[in-house]
Design a protein with these regions (language model features):
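Internal alpha/beta loop-helix hairpins
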Residues: 1-32
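Short aromatic-glycine-enriched beta-strand elements
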Residues: 23-26, 86-92
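Glycine/charge-rich catalytic "coupling/switch" loops of P-loop NTPases
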Residues: 24-80, 99, 109-138
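Canonical phosphoinositide-binding patch of PH/PH-like domains
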Residues: 101-103
């Protein structure tokens, strides 16, 4: 968990429910099902996390406003703040009550007030045990 607070902006954290279907594992964040890659899925299956709530962490650079980049793991949200910082753009938005930040291409056309489908790179996601705060997979 501590690693999530290193860097600026810090990692996005969302509570998620683990859903196992054979070898497939999704993290359910409200109405969104985010499919985990096989290596990360195995850690959750082996740990007996089916049906349990975990904490999903994803860094802002692993969230894009190009949903086609990660079609199996998208969330839709209204942009609350657009922040241009030199060669970087940060987009701030809420997903199912959780604050999120995306660091996106500075040429983005996304702006404050726009509703955007964001793609999450699930190969880069970190999953933590909600009770012990220990890393399950990263």
């Amino acid at each position: 968990f501590v690693a999530g607070f290193i860097g600026s902006p810090q990692m996005n954290f969302l509570d998620a429910t683990v859903k196992v279907n054979g070898k497939d594992v999704t993290l359910q964040v409200g109405n969104y099902s985010l499919k985990l890659p096989e290596n990360k899925a195995k850690a959750l299956i082996d740990g007996g996390y089916d049906g349990k709530t975990v904490v999903m962490g994803i860094r802002p650079e692993d969230v894009t406003d190009d949903a086609t980049a990660f079609p199996e793991s998208t969330v839709e949200a209204k942009i609350n703040v657009y922040e241009l910082l030199g060669a970087e753009v940060f987009l701030y938005f809420d997903v199912e009550g959780f604050n999120m930040t995306a660091r996106v291409d500075p040429h983005t056309t996304s702006r404050t007030g726009d509703t955007v489908k964001f793609g999450l790179d699930m190969t880069k996601v970190h999953v933590f045990d909600k009770e012990t705060e220990l890393t399950i997979t990263n």
